[in-house]
């Protein structure tokens, strides 16, 4: 898991466009389209994942929330720069977006990690194994650290880091989607 995140980090740290100063709106549009596709498939999955009484099992409820959190984070994170960007006042137009992304990223571990602990205590240890928890915690913490460094420490926009955060949301959303499809609570 760590190796995969390291490779992704190096890909975003070393590409030819790493020193670019302009927003890559095509990359943001692509990330938004992928997020929208994942959310669309998630909506179908949500409709098919209901149990007989019309609700969700506790693990499915958790994964649906995680799907929506990460998918909507990537979607709105990729759409908002189109609305906010103002070339004449670049720093001022990005700062609210960076602070908003930091708050949104901070919400993830604060909300989802206690729920995972509660689900594991409720008898769902086989559905939430430690490697999956470590994978999700790594993504949560990486997103929080990177967004905090952009919003609070650096104070300016680093487009490749911003795209990296959105990509982490998509990786986490894809992971939750795949696990929801292939690993059910009753199995």
Which role does the model predict for each range below?
Residues 33-52:
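N-terminal signal-anchor/start-transfer transmembrane helix
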Residues 1-18:
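N-terminal secretory/membrane targeting signals
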Residues 141-187:
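Terminal transmembrane helical module of multi-pass membrane proteins
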Residues 15, 75-82, 137-154:
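Hydrophobic alpha-helical transmembrane segments in multi-pass integral membrane proteins
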Residues 35-41, 69-77, 95-113:
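Generic alpha-helical transmembrane segments
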Residues 29-33, 56-75, 123-140:
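Juxtamembrane helix-loop boundaries in multi-pass membrane proteins
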Residues 19-39:
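Hydrophobic transmembrane alpha-helical segments in integral membrane proteins
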Residues 83-146:
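Membrane-proximal helix-loop-helix units in multi-pass membrane proteins
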């Amino acid at each position: 898991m760590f190796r995969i995140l390291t490779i992704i980090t190096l890909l975003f740290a070393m590409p030819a466009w790493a020193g670019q100063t302009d927003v890559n709106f095509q990359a943001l549009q692509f990330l938004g389209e992928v997020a929208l596709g994942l959310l669309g498939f998630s909506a179908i999955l949500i409709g098919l994942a209901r149990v007989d009484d019309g609700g969700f099992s506790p693990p499915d409820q958790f994964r649906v929330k995680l799907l929506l959190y990460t998918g909507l984070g990537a979607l709105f994170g990729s759409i908002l720069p189109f609305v906010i960007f103002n070339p004449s006042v670049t720093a001022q137009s990005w700062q609210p977006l960076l602070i908003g992304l930091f708050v949104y990223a901070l919400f993830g571990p604060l909300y989802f990690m206690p729920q995972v602990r509660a689900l594991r205590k409720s008898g769902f240890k086989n559905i939430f194994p430690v490697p999956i928890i470590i994978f999700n915690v790594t993504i949560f913490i990486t997103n929080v650290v990177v967004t905090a460094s952009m919003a609070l420490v650096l104070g300016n926009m680093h487009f490749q880091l911003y795209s990296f955060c959105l990509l982490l949301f998509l990786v986490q959303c894809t992971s939750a989607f795949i696990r929801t499809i292939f690993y059910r609570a009753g199995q």
